[in-house]
Amino acid sequence: MLERRYLVLEDGTYYEGYKLGSNDLSVGEIVFNTAMTGYQETISDPSYTGQIITFTYPLIGNYGINRDDFEALTPTLNGVVVKEASTHPSNFRNQKTLHDVLVQYKIPGISGVDTRSITRKIRQHGVLKAGFTDNRDDIDSLINTLKSTELPRDEVETVSTKTPYVSTGSDLSVVLLDFGKKQNIVRELNMRGCNVTVVPYNTTAEEILAMSPDGVMLSNGPGDPDVVEVAIEMIKGILGKIPFFGICLGHQLFALSQGGTSFKMKFGHRGANHPVKDLRSGKVDITSQNHGYAIDKNSLVNTDLEVTHIALNDGTVEGLRHKTLPAFSVQYHPEARPGPSDSNYLFDEFMTMMKEFKEKEQTANA
């Protein structure tokens, strides 16, 4: 017989369902993701650190989970909410069920709830604090706890690598600042022959320049970009000296370093089907996104940044490029995983930028 579990929101709303995953109950910011597949990559994305994910697709876990498709070694989210969790996955690569993996990593979850209702509430009222309890009598107490709980805004230190390491390639060298990187960023660079050195989020400009890389990338990551001040100062120190490419949180930090400002979105962009328009070509890409903060377009007016991409759903800034220096960024995930590969060409643009900058430097020093 399935045991009861309750998902409780800070506004007093609660949903009765069934236990899924760990008995180590937790609280977090509840968000929703609209992707139909890719749940393994989603739950292992460090950008979800501290959050509780509501999957809008009604059946999650139907093709199981395997050891190769994790985007980080250890998932760091605080909970999973699904309409139905598959107990009998069918796929030749399947090794574990969703429930087994959630238990393994001490992540609580709930199934059998109306995920459409939860999603509508988040969409209408914005993200809320939420938590789980297995005892109906504890709901009122949990509501009070949620109201008084201050969720952390800075989760980058939790998920960033503590020591540098190298993913070997044979061509250009790239330093990747790890704010909670997805592994597929490294894969995309390695596929293009790059030698990738992954370094902690608080690595200084001087330390990066001492490595003499051909380019620098800033990864995705969780939390509020305003609190990662050390990275903002680092960007100021390398800009113009090395080609630069930022993704997601890296995009936001790039904008902040040049005088832009960020804001917390009502419910964010999380899914694998977000249309983005390239203002230079008019082309529309379907993109994978996962962010709760965005850059204020009006704050960029008197900066050296130009907006290159916008979200077609709400007009928010999705891409930036420096007007004179070799640096650009996107708010979405060109490496996908999960999601479409429409924007993989951005890695090729970064490769071209690095090669042209290197040739220019060599010519100048000849």
Curated annotation (Swiss-Prot):
The keyword Cell membrane does not apply. The gene is carA. PROSITE patterns: GATASE_TYPE_1. Composed of two chains; the small (or glutamine) chain promotes the hydrolysis of glutamine to ammonia, which is used by the large (or ammonia) chain to synthesize carbamoyl phosphate. Tetramer of heterodimers (alpha,beta)4. This is Carbamoyl phosphate synthase small chain. Belongs to the CarA family. SMART domains: CPSase_sm_chain. One of its GO terms (molecular function) is glutaminase activity.
